[in-house]
Design a protein with these regions (language model features):
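Active-site neighborhood for divalent-cation/phosphate handling
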Residues: 2-95, 186-187
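Small-residue (GG/TT-enriched) beta-loop-alpha framework at ligand/catalytic clefts
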Residues: 13-15, 56-150
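Short hydrophobic segments within beta-strands
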Residues: 22, 105, 157-158
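Gly/Ser/Thr-rich loops at beta-strand to alpha-helix junctions
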Residues: 26-28, 109-111, 162
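Generic domain-boundary/flexible-linker signal
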Residues: 30-32, 125, 166
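Surface loops and adjacent helix of pleckstrin homology
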Residues: 33, 117, 183
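Accessory, usually C-terminal, subdomains that scaffold auxiliary metal cofactors
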Residues: 127-206
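Short acidic DE-rich linear segments
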Residues: 209-210
Length: 210
């Protein structure tokens, strides 16, 4: 239980000045700055699939805003001073660290998050549930077709993926340039000494989120 972990875990239970959490939610939309009305957020409710509280995150350098809502059960389990972000925020924060056209894929144990940059602009971002390599292959083919990707586009990988697993082998069927994307900025965590650095790229990217 998440709430119990925050109360009892030796690391999580400490008194922090600030806590950041990137949380998966299917209730999110992107709104360009010119169409965004901070004073009238209720107008976006019909696009959200939820009538719960709407959170907003402005991406200064990107020119748009993320609007999202969370499951009430999740909100209740987080410490009061938690600053919440949608799962897309760490990838958006890392977009400035990529040069040229690129596909960035962030893996968890049962899902993956995709960001595509073309002509120095974010043109695509989405999140997919994939329980196995077969499901991953299905969604990957959809993405390739939708974005018109070629085998030469650079693909940067982070999260729970390794060179010897089926997900990596699946990517090799369609792309020639695969790279592990390592954490941006300072890295003082002891975790990085014991695990592959790219496992924590998305987590540490939260430090870049405003």
């Amino acid at each position: 239980d998440l709430k119990f972990a925050f109360e009892t875990d030796a690391h999580l239970a400490q008194s922090y000045g600030a806590i950041k959490a990137a949380i998966h939610t299917s209730n999110f939309i992107f709104i360009p700055d010119e169409w965004f009305d901070q004073e009238n957020l209720s107008v976006y409710t019909k696009f959200m699939g939820s009538e719960r509280k709407i959170y907003t995150k402005h991406h200064d350098e990107l020119g748009f805003n993320t609007l999202f809502s969370l499951d009430e059960k999740v909100e209740e389990k987080l410490p009061e001073n938690t600053v919440v972000y949608p799962q897309s925020s760490p990838l958006l924060a890392l977009s400035g660290h990529l040069s040229g056209d690129a596909l960035l894929v962030d893996f968890t144990a049962t899902s993956f998050n995709v960001l595509f940059i073309k002509d120095k602009k974010i043109t695509f971002q989405n999140h997919y549930e994939a329980e196995n390599a077969e499901e991953f292959n299905y969604f990957l083919l959809l993405i390739i077709e939708q974005l018109g990707l070629t085998e030469s586009v650079p693909v940067y990988l982070q999260g729970i993926i390794n060179e010897d697993d089926e997900y990596y082998s699946t990517l090799l069927k369609y792309f020639n340039n695969l790279y592990f994307f390592f954490p941006a900025g300072k890295q003082n965590s002891e975790l990085l000494a014991d695990m592959p650095k790219h496992y924590f790229s998305g987590l540490l990217a939260l430090d870049l989120c405003e």
